[in-house]
């Protein structure tokens, strides 16, 4: 049984502590793929949920003073339960507040995968970095940033951009699937975090090949969505992306994946 078949057979429970802007899209995307999202944010039930969950997604897009302690508490409970965590440090370089929170979070919680654009990941290893928001910086050296971040933070790194870079231990892989329309809808990167979590299967040390498959399945679905005859902009693309995630299969993944080890 391949990983995508396993995902659809097991319907892994993924706890999505994500931002308010993308909750609906993230939930629908994971359901389309075959996972079972739970949008629970109450620390009072975190122990029960993480015990059952395949993984926990933490996305700080709408971080506030009111929820920061809950995020850290839920992360620590996931660590105690052996539940892998995908961390998405949205716009970490945009404010001192976000930088300080991420520095504290990564000091107190062990994460399995960190996903972000090059600017966000660079900020995590150099908190003097500044950025304008969630947009990526195409001029940054994503390969070296990913390599340094994987070593410094001792975790798997996924850097998104025109090409995606995955680094784990000393291995680095560049992926070249995807669609420019992903940058025209809100929550595309946030959903990818959920897709990564869906592929973890309670494994806190996933192989880089598993991460490659998770990212590529999503990006290939985006390519197919863009190519659909009725898609003529972001609105039709968004709904078609859900359909393509639903229709994705292992043969399509293997035939379409564009990857190279660096």
Swiss-Prot record:
Q: Which Gene3D superfamilies match?
A: 3.40.1190.20
- Supply the alphabetized keyword list: ATP-binding, Kinase, Magnesium, Metal-binding, Nucleotide-binding, Thiamine biosynthesis, Transferase
Query: Could you say which EC number(s) this protein's record lists?
Result: 2.7.1.50
Quick one: which pathway?
Cofactor biosynthesis; thiamine diphosphate biosynthesis; 4-methyl-5-(2-phosphoethyl)-thiazole from 5-(2-hydroxyethyl)-4-methylthiazole: step 1/1
Q: Which residues form a coiled coil?
A: none
Give the matching SUPFAM superfamilies. Answer: Ribokinase-like
Q: Which domain of life is it from?
A: Bacteria
MF terms from GO for this chain are: ATP binding; hydroxyethylthiazole kinase activity; magnesium ion binding
- The UniProt record gives the binding positions of ATP as 115, 160
Described function = Catalyzes the phosphorylation of the hydroxyl group of 4-methyl-5-beta-hydroxyethylthiazole (THZ).
Q: What is this protein called?
A: Hydroxyethylthiazole kinase
């Amino acid at each position: 049984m391949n990983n995508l078949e396993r995902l659809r057979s097991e319907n892994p429970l993924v706890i999505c502590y994500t931002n308010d802007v993308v909750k609906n899209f993230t939930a629908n995307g994971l359901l389309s793929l075959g996972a079972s999202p739970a949008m629970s944010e109450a620390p009072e039930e975190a122990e029960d949920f993480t015990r059952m969950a395949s993984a926990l997604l933490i996305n700080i897009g709408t971080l506030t003073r009111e929820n920061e302690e809950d995020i850290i508490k839920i992360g620590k409970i996931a660590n105690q339960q052996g539940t892998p965590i995908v961390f998405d440090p949205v716009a970490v370089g945009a404010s001192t507040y976000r930088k300080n929170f991420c520095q504290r979070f990564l000091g107190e919680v062990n994460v399995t995968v960190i996903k972000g654009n090059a600017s966000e990941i660079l900020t995590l290893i150099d908190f003097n970095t500044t950025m304008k928001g969630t947009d990526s910086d195409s001029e940054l050296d994503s390969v070296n940033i990913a390599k340094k971040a994987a070593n410094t933070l001792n975790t798997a790194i996924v850097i998104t951009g025109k090409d995606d870079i995955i680094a784990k231990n000393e291995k680095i892989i560049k992926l070249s699937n995807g669609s420019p329309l992903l940058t025209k809808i809100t929550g595309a990167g946030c959903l990818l975090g959920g897709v990564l979590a869906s592929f973890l299967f309670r494994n806190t040390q996933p192989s880089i090949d598993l991460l490659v498959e998770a990212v590529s399945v999503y990006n290939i679905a985006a390519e197919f969505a863009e190519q659909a005859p009725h898609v003529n902009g972001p609105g039709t693309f968004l709904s078609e992306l859900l359909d393509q995630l639903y229709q994705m299969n292992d043969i399509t993944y293997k035939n379409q994946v564009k990857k190279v080890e660096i």
